[in-house]
């Protein structure tokens, strides 16, 4: 017997339709699509809920797969996750490529470049930390760096080779994942979700989680329908913290970290502008230039916490072009095609919120140790594209009942009151 809908799960209007799937994934960015594809590959039917899939941070992202370059002090747990994800990328990309026209994954290396003596010291200090963690970063002479990348400025102060840091084109990746999800449904009709577009897509916004018998059983939709599922995975980035029906006391402290990013066309006489991803420091400010297979480059990215939302900052565009030109002067001759700004979902420790939610004493999931039917996968900050294969594998393991203890530091509960101090998660049913 059901009771009235909990107000936190959105408007209590009667559902216009009900979609049923083994797994509901809330959020259609790269992470959500990757999780959905991995769940589908395990033989589960998947409903991917998003009213504008691929339009958020994933659309703007440069797609650097850079666990070595992205190492920061006191982020060893995150480094282990990034290295795990990096090791999964070849197989992940090959699986997508086998089902589609290609994922946009490239194993081109990364070149770290410093513009002045202070930048050189900063990069060498970082190299010491990288080496202490067993990571390969080799100094190059400026002459050798310019042999590899002839359009680098002769005035740069240093260069370091980072062969393990690669790249993927997130826009191509998203298109390939959509193609793979739809193709799997066509190949195995049993995976099709009735009422979903192409057998998997639910083009609506999730209003809130639905509960029954103390477990999460799906999500309500802003348009009035519902998605019922054995497991629901919350992967909608910044919107996750505002989702209705989250377990009582669960705090998902997500903050928007905006970034401006540019896309430019390289004239024929300058192609290739660079063949490696160039990550630079220019007077202490980071900038990168990522080459694409179509002859364009991506230059990014600022990092700002302001009120501009998705508006592009004029100062950010100026800074990016100025600093990129300091490293590769020919940037001045490129055609500016696109300026984009999006917000990345950051957390207080810059690490993701990833895993099941511990259950409160007396709740339906207390014996199992977690809230039944719910997985959180958000807060990936700068690393969403890189971490996608790891997040997908971790969620697939959780669906099968396996929790890898290595990833306990990323528990989505770590900024909340401990489960033992919380009351029963839900006393009302919402379906």
Language model: regions and residue ranges:
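Extreme N-terminal leader/targeting segments of oxidoreductases
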Residues: 1-22, 41
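N-terminal Rossmann-like FAD-binding beta1-loop-alpha1 element of flavoenzymes
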Residues: 21-47
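Short hydrophobic core segments
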Residues: 24-26, 227-239, 392
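Dinucleotide-binding Rossmann-like beta1-alpha1 core, especially the glycine-rich loop
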Residues: 64-148
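Helical element adjacent to the flavin cofactor pocket in flavoenzyme catalytic cores
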Residues: 160-223
